[in-house]
Design a protein with these regions (language model features):
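Conserved active-site-adjacent core of cysteine acyl-enzyme catalytic domains
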Residues: 59-181
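Active-site nucleophile-adjacent alpha helix/oxyanion-hole segment immediately C-terminal to the catalytic cysteine
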Residues: 1-67
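Short acidic, gly/pro-rich beta-turn/loop elements at beta-sheet edges
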Residues: 27, 144, 199
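Low-complexity, Gly/Ser/Thr/Pro-rich intrinsically disordered linker/tail segments
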Residues: 177-202
Length: 202
């Protein structure tokens, strides 16, 4: 008798973890953003309809300019992710009156010690209205959201269901020089009150 097939999960056939990381990052940042009035607390998390709309906006921009849908399968590089984060800021400005400020603290650096990355993430994530997106190198090739740094672990909000990542796994304990997380693939997100002139910056 043929073996019962295993169900495919999100990510098995698509490379949309970058899009999911942006959506999850915004959801987490909204969770801790200080709303001015208590009655707005219930509006911290976007509705399913809002999340679907944001997902469509990001997906449309990802494939724009392509005569095929390969970006959906092949995934998102750091340049594309940065562009999509800017589009997300436009969406937040329209729907929430907020702007999403994006920083790449180690952009252009070939190597950053694990402890320095962890310290930077930890200091950033204790602030309200923040999240971080990391790109994990091959063989995983995956974008994920960091919500907290705890001891020697990164606590995640991950589209593939992973709950944490050990620093020893991706840092100095890794055989490759830069570890599993390249400095260019670290994005710090912060929500602020919207100003039309405010854009995502490197």
């Amino acid at each position: 008798m043929p073996r019962r097939p295993t169900a495919l999960e999100q990510g098995a056939l698509d490379g949309l973890c970058g899009v999911y990381s942006i959506v999850n990052g915004i959801v987490w940042a909204l969770r801790t953003y200080p709303h001015p009035r208590p009655q707005k607390q219930g509006r911290r998390r976007p509705s399913d309809e809002e999340l679907g709309d944001l997902f469509i906006v990001l997906l449309s921009n990802l494939v724009r300019g392509h005569s095929h849908l390969k970006p959906i399968v092949e995934g998102t590089n750091s340049r594309q992710l940065f562009r999509l984060l800017s589009k997300s800021s436009d969406w937040l400005r329209k729907h929430r009156g907020l702007a999403l400020v994006t920083r790449r603290p180690f952009h252009g650096r070939p190597y950053v010690p694990t402890t320095q990355v962890a310290q930077k993430l930890g200091r950033h994530l204790v602030r309200p209205g923040t999240a971080a997106i990391l790109g994990i190198e091959a063989p995983f090739d995956h974008w994920t959201v960091v919500r907290q740094v705890a001891q020697q672990r990164l606590l995640l909000l991950d589209s593939a269901g992973t709950s944490q990542l050990s620093m020893k796994t991706w840092g100095e304990g890794c055989s490759r020089k830069t570890g599993l997380i390249h400095p260019d693939n670290i994005f710090l997100l912060k929500l602020t009150k919207s100003k039309r002139a405010r854009k995502a910056v490197a």
